[in-house]
Amino acid sequence: MIFDSHMHSKFSTDSNMNILDAIAVGKEKNIGIIITDHMDLDYPVKDEFKFDVPTYFNEYEKYRSSNVKLGIEIGLTTNTVSENEAIAKNYDFDFVLGSIHAVKGLDIYVDYVHQGYNKKQFFTYYFEDMLKCVQLHDNFDSLSHIDYPCRYCKFDNNEILVSEFKDILAEIFTTLINKGKVLELNTARLHVPESNKAMRDIYKLYMDLGGKYVTIGSDAHSPLNI
């Protein structure tokens, strides 16, 4: 069965999706679903993008089945390695996404995109932080939405081009592969022709380096996007 392994319910600050609606869409589309609510311990706004894990399991455990899984999306930063490891280790998650939502301590969506970097600087700093995080963390199964900043940056061409960032992408992918981690194929921007082409090149590099598997995730925050 194919799983949509990246979606957010009411336990995420930026979503109010009801798990029952997500389950219904999964049944309608004949796919499995994995709930992966946000846990960004280093998020600059106190209490946002964090949730009470015991309450999450107390409320959702009754829905767990062969095609409904309970996961988490952990924001990877160099400042929260031990705390992130503890969350992943101490709770019975079926699946853990690792994500880069901040660069140089700045939230990508709120602050980082407004720092005035040119495209080369913008993505180089992003990938440098990503490489450090995947080297330091062992708590995740799949690295999510590698093109996340492309949603918000404002360059003439927002896409990640392998020709521009091949060396550091190769370091990241080799680290993932050597650790037994995989890369997520995030579907949120695949409808954009330029994104589709750029992502094909990125995943070809991943495959050429020995990557055998991907997880598929919509990053849905509402049932319509599953």
Model regions and ranges:
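An N-terminally biased module of ancient metal coordination in phosphate/nucleic-acid-related enzymes
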Residues: 1-78, 90, 94, 152-154, ...
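Residues at alpha-helix caps and immediate loop-helix transition turns in enzyme cores, especially N-
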Residues: 15-18, 80-83, 195-199
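A short acidic, amphipathic alpha-helical/loop segment
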Residues: 21, 83-87, 201-205
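Short hydrophobic "helix-edge" motifs at membrane interfaces and signal-peptide entry regions
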Residues: 27, 135-136, 208-210
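Hydrophobic residues within beta-strands of alpha/beta enzymes
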Residues: 33-35, 96, 143, 183, ...
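Short glycine-/acidic-enriched loop or helix-start segments at secondary-structure transitions
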Residues: 45, 107-108, 194, 226
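Extended substrate/RNA-proximal surfaces in nucleic-acid metabolism proteins
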Residues: 47-178
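Active-site-adjacent C-terminal substructures of enzyme catalytic domains
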Residues: 163-226
